[in-house]
Amino acid sequence: MLKAKLATFLLTVSYVAIPFSVSAQSWGPRTLPQLKAEAQRRADGALPPVDHVKPADMREALAQINSLEPDEWAKAFIMIGDRYMIQAEQALKTNSDQAALSFKHAWEVYNAARWPTENSPQKKLAYEKALAAFAQYGKLISPPVEVVRFPFEGKQAVAYLRLPKDVRPAPLIFAISGLDTRKEDMVVTNDLFLKNGIGIFAIDQPGTGQSPLKIDVGSERVFSAALDYLQTRNDVDAKRIVVRGQSWAGYWAAIMGYTEKDRIRGTVVHG
């Protein structure tokens, strides 16, 4: 018994005395210097959630932040996003490729401003600006991003659709965004599917982005309404749809695996 207690004591001491790494999710609140260092490290290494933010833009934004207030964080990035929007509007007159790139950078910086969720006035503003920048970017890429709206319980739900150039009707990946990602991320980061003749339908999970529902039991019904809509389109092969749920959206993908088993080919729980 004494040996067992001693072993337990030594094991406990070893964990306390020896430094070890933990995931960001299990770490406590960061100080401002810690937050800045981690944000810059992720930008430098192209790591999520700021993997598309230029390191120089991150340094510029962080230099303007002097507190942990969400609005101060958002304002610093909004300023940079606004600059990219001006560049994009100017480039539209002569160089659509450059305009697309500037709209993309604007969206990515605004997206960093609103991350992880739109819970303050400036973060809400950043999200509105991100949607506007993305809409312009989506028009200029190939294949373009189509904004689709479908009826849902007296309202309109919003999603995105991209179809491969030469396949009609096209099979689809039905992509649901995670807790801190948005449908914009889903629809422009899956080009490999498009190159292989598979379209992308992207939608926000309940409680995030432009979803008309909060997270609750039964909120998957918005996805059923989306399937209803997709069945009305002649350019979509509604008999060949696979649902992909990223991160927390894997929960919704799993649910759709049995609630919509007769209308989908399968689900991928990715997260």
Regions found by a protein language model. Give the residues of each.
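Short beta-strand element of the alpha/beta-hydrolase
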Residues: 169-178
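The serine-hydrolase catalytic nucleophile loop
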Residues: 179-191
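N-terminal cap/lid segment of alpha/beta-hydrolase-fold proteins
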Residues: 77, 118-167
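Alpha/beta-hydrolase
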Residues: 176, 203-205, 270
